[in-house]
Regions:
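Alpha-helical transmembrane segments of multipass membrane proteins
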Residues: 81-82, 190
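P-loop NTPase switch/communication element
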Residues: 56-59, 83-121, 125-126, 231-232
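Residues at the beta-strand->loop junction immediately N-terminal to the Walker
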Residues: 64
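P-loop NTPase motor-domain active sites and their immediate coupling elements
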Residues: 5-40, 44-46, 50-52, 57-58, ...
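The conserved Walker
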Residues: 67-68, 220
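Hydrophobic positions on the alpha1 helix immediately C-terminal to the Walker A/P-loop
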Residues: 74, 78
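Short beta-strand
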Residues: 1-2
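Conserved lysine of the Walker
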Residues: 71
């Protein structure tokens, strides 16, 4: 049915395909003129309308799609959109890439809080650091009587910058507090190794980190209930589904069928936290060479910032330090259960 008319429309495929490039989305007036700091380009609908979403409003995103569905390209779209919006002083990333070949392209950009994380243990550590950073930021907001990071930037930081010279070393400026976006490219690999720690870390951040400018983008090619648990789903209302293998997988990610019928190669169903039903669109296409060109440009025109998180390699030593936001350790067997040692002794004696 056609809305507003007593007619029925039949969709016919175009005889010639048109490529939806990321550049056409980033040059859209809606994207260029928007004041939203974390606006990202999603794609174009069947009518040619461009779709954008504000990560600050989402405030977290769950992405699922099988191999070849365009999941990795979609993640690149989101990252490049954010890089076009904000510089390293206003936006920082923590990237987790167990596959080691997708997000490592961004290893040299100054936006990274730490080099791209490839090990499951370090991913858990990064989530623990983010939780401590979240608590610290809440203390900062409380001390300045600000409701959220947007209010803090507008009423505290911008006001101080208008009244003072940033180069004046005698004045102590309020903390800048950049937005932090945590991107995990393959949730299933880490969930296999540390299911309880990963779920707890994600849920804690998803419940509370929105107000302090920390956001999660999680992707997986296996959207089963073992990977996308009920707690994770309940706390991440924004979903982006590419082609999946079965209707069960579609219901896991969207709570509705449909994603199993998508065509692949960026054909997407997006359901935001404020949407009653998913919207179908074609995600923008971006090549590996284009990603490398953007990275080279950013590295050339920006000074490298010191890593805010340094993750050590040893298992038994202090393995992580930060620039004033606390430290965190590798997860160990002793973290799993207080009675683990006693149970182990009982099994040995038996």
């Amino acid at each position: 049915p056609i809305p507003g008319k007593s007619l029925v429309g039949i969709e016919l495929p175009n005889t010639t395909k048109s490529n939806v490039g990321l550049g056409s989305l980033l040059s859209d007036k809606e994207f260029e003129n928007s004041p939203k700091p974390l606006l990202v380009a999603l794609g174009k609908g069947v009518t040619g309308k461009s779709y954008f979403a504000d990560i600050a409003k989402m405030p977290h995103l769950l992405i699922a799609g099988t191999t070849g569905s365009g999941k990795s390209v979609t993640v690149h779209n989101l990252i490049l959109s954010l890089l076009y919006r904000k510089g390293p002083k206003d936006l920082r990333f923590i990237m987790v890439d167990p596959k080691r070949v997708e997000l490592t392209l961004y290893n040299n950009i100054p936006h990274l809080l730490t080099p791209v994380i490839k090990e499951a243990k370090k991913a858990i550590m990064a989530l623990r650091w983010a939780a401590k950073e979240m608590e610290r930021r809440y203390d900062v907001l409380e001390s300045h009587s600000s409701r959220d990071i947007g209010s803090y930037h507008t009423n505290i930081l911008a006001k101080w910058q208008n009244e003072h010279d940033e180069n004046d070393r005698t004045q102590v400026s309020p903390e800048r507090m950049p937005y932090i976006v945590i991107i995990i490219d393959e949730l299933a690999d880490i969930m296999q190794a540390y299911p309880r720690e990963l779920e707890a870390g994600i849920v804690r951040l998803a419940q509370m980190s929105r107000a302090v400018g920390i956001h999660l983008i999680l992707s997986t090619q296996r959207p089963s209930v073992n990977v996308i648990t009920g707690l994770i789903k309940a706390n991440i209302p924004s979903r982006l589904a590419l082609q999946v293998a079965s209707q069960i997988d579609s219901r896991t990610i969207l709570d509705a069928p449909g994603a199993e019928s998508l065509l692949g190669k960026g054909d997407t169903l997006f359901q935001g936290s404020d949407m009653s039903k998913p919207e179908r669109m074609q995600c923008g296409n971006v090549s590996e060479e284009e990603v490398k060109n953007v990275v080279r440009y950013i590295v050339k025109h920006n000074d490298m910032l010191p890593d805010d998180i340094t993750i050590g390699e040893g298992m038994d030593e202090s393995v992580a330090t930060t620039t004033g936001s606390g430290s965190f350790d590798y997860p160990s067997d002793s973290d799993d259960d207080e009675l683990y040692g006693e149970a182990l002794r009982a099994v040995r004696e038996a």
